[in-house]
Amino acid sequence: MLDLKRIRTDFDTVAAKLKNRGVSEDTLTHLKELDEKRRTLLVQSEELKAERNIASAAIAQAKRQKEDATQQIADMQKVSADIKTIDNQLVAIDQQVADIITVLPNTPHDSVPVGADEEDNVEIRRWGTPRDFDFEVKAHWDLGEDLDILDWERGAKVTGARFLFYKNLGARLERALYNFMLDEHIKEGYQEIITPYMVNHDSMFGTGQYPKFKEDTFELADTNFVLIPTAEVPLTNYYRGEILDGKELPIYFTAMSPSFRSEAGSAGRDTRGLIRLHQFHKVEMVKFAKPEESYQELEKMTANAENILQKLGLPYRVISLCTGDMGFSAAKTYDLEVWIPAQNTYREISSCSNTEDFQARRAQIRYRDEADGKVKLLHTLNGSGLAVGRTVAAILENYQNEDGSVTIPEVLRPYMGGETVISPK
């Protein structure tokens, strides 16, 4: 959530930044007018309360001296009524301000490219060279069926579209991947966490999913619970409402969890395969950092995600998302896109973001600065390290062989009991 004081004192800069994120200046102007009216009413309310206090003292004095206080009482009653009217107006204005400010996206960092959509994203670097196949490549969903490791038909029967069963060496490959990912992140100083897979509405507000993106989630009827769309939500909210010791920062968390997404608005997109599912595993990274260190931590986090792809030998590229393509809470985002041979393109497999103090303000996560003793908002960061199902898809396609088998990447073999290849039955 943005700082209302910042909008008030640096309106033109904030308006220009949010315009690049699709927010109209009229919305911000209306917010500014509401804020000005609110501040005026607060002054009036305080003046009237001071007047009421004086009148109350005068009435008490008159009663002590056995004097008639009828007029003073009438005057005080009018003042009290005026205060109530103003307070009711303030409640209404506060709600209007909240309705606007809670759905405003974060302001982009100055280094973020300005653009409308993914066409304006900027490629930063590439790693690895896509393999030159001398046979016709298969899509991962066909490989999965031929190898008897992915069962889409029964997933649809048991649950519905965009669900599947992993089986045999497919299940072992999925498990090997997330264990490998977690082990690599732990080596880099991340604390492993097993989170709840349901959170409450306050947690969804804290990380920015609520109120704007409720349609993208699965809520449990007649409860305050939501299935997590990402482990970012419980990990970030772990410290919600707390003040941390500045000497402890930065703090690194990692977790593997299922992620549940309704994929609202995705009808017709990626209807086959592992790219877009309602339920998938993802290894998440979350950081809590001091403001002056957060962009250095973003580079480290992105490197941590890249490390997984490099050790798996999967070609990828790093993209800096433009202002029009970034997520709601992000101030800056790097996407990692892995090469998918059957589609002859790169597809997103990780997204690493610095939200600066946007989530921390919503969730009230602060730290006490050891230098001056002041309590300040910290910065939160989050990143995929990686989306496991998409990594399975990338391995199946990049490591496929002409005979229909798939070679298991060397780093995963110790996690799979020494298996080296997945062969057709």
UniProtKB/Swiss-Prot annotation:
Gene3D superfamilies: Bira Bifunctional Protein, Domain 2, Serine-tRNA synthetase, tRNA binding domain. It is found in: Cytoplasm. One of its GO terms (biological process) is selenocysteine biosynthetic process. InterPro entries: aa-tRNA-synt_IIb, aa-tRNA-synth_II, aa-tRNA-synth_II/BPL/LPL, Ser-tRNA-ligase_type_1, Ser-tRNA-synth_1_N, SerRS_1_N_sf, SerRS_core, tRNA-bd_arm. It catalyses: tRNA(Ser) + L-serine + ATP = L-seryl-tRNA(Ser) + AMP + diphosphate + H(+); tRNA(Sec) + L-serine + ATP = L-seryl-tRNA(Sec) + AMP + diphosphate + H(+). Its EC number is 6.1.1.11. ATP binds at R261, S262, E263, E348, I349, S350, S351. L-serine binds at T230, A231, E232, E284, S384. Its main location: cytoplasm. The keyword Ligase applies. Keywords: Aminoacyl-tRNA synthetase, ATP-binding, Cytoplasm, Ligase, Nucleotide-binding, Protein biosynthesis. GO terms for cellular component: cytoplasm. Pathway: Aminoacyl-tRNA biosynthesis; selenocysteinyl-tRNA(Sec) biosynthesis; L-seryl-tRNA(Sec) from L-serine and tRNA(Sec): step 1/1. GO terms for molecular function: ATP binding; catalytic activity, acting on a protein; serine-tRNA ligase activity; transferase activity. Homodimer. The tRNA molecule binds across the dimer. Belongs to the class-II aminoacyl-tRNA synthetase family. Type-1 seryl-tRNA synthetase subfamily. Catalyzes the attachment of serine to tRNA(Ser). Is also able to aminoacylate tRNA(Sec) with serine, to form the misacylated tRNA L-seryl-tRNA(Sec), which will be further converted into selenocysteinyl-tRNA(Sec). Consists of two distinct domains, a catalytic core and a N-terminal extension that is involved in tRNA binding. This is Serine--tRNA ligase. It comes from Streptococcus pyogenes serotype M6 (strain ATCC BAA-946 / MGAS10394). The gene is serS.
